[in-house]
Design a protein with these regions (language model features):
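C-terminal segments
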Residues: 1-85, 89-91, 98-182
């Protein structure tokens, strides 16, 4: 089954559950108190931290038993960096939380609301005026990319960059890729 945002999706039976990057989440918990959020936004940010803690496939594995008794395992890998495009501070922070919990570095443009907090997020957040040149493989588009920007991404040399529509929030499971080992 595909890992997408659908109400019917059921998590696979895991022999080893996903493990969030707790160090990154602790740093983000500290940052929540510095961000200019009102009480309702702080509650939403805290909920995003809790959600990221349990909804990750980082270091998760499931065992698939073959018909002749062989042991096959299925695990997932994530990219090193994902570009978060657009959104307000709360939306961008929620996407950062999902990515950081999965051990993924977030790349933003200098005009992103998160960019001014890059000193507090060293190693978790990278600011780059040309994110497509920062070794990204995915774009979490909180706001739709302009057609010019899409043309620019399509016309560049190298691997394709996958655009993840994230207007309703980033679904971290879309970022992971299956790896099967026998």
């Amino acid at each position: 089954q595909r890992l997408v945002r659908t109400p019917e999706w059921v998590a696979p039976t895991l022999s080893r559950i996903g493990q969030a990057d707790e160090d990154a989440l602790k740093r983000l918990e500290t940052l929540v108190h510095k961000l200019p959020f009102n009480a309702e936004e702080k509650k939403t940010a805290a909920a995003a931290l809790g959600h990221a803690r349990v909804r990750t496939l980082r270091k998760a594995e499931t065992v698939l038993v073959g018909p002749t008794g062989e042991r096959n395992s299925l695990s997932w890998r994530s990219p090193k960096r994902v570009w978060v495009h657009g959104g307000n501070l709360l939306q961008a922070f929620s996407a950062l939380t999902e990515l950081a919990a999965a051990g993924i570095q977030t790349v933003v443009e200098p005009n992103s609301p998160l960019a001014s907090y890059s000193a507090d997020l060293d190693g978790l957040l990278q600011v780059n005026s040309k994110p497509e040149n920062a070794g990204i493989s995915h774009v979490a588009a909180i706001e739709p990319l302009s057609s010019e920007r899409k043309q620019e991404l399509a016309g560049r040399d190298g691997a394709l960059i996958r655009i993840l529509p994230s207007e309703q929030g980033l679904d971290i499971l879309q970022v992971f890729e299956e790896i099967s080992c026998s």
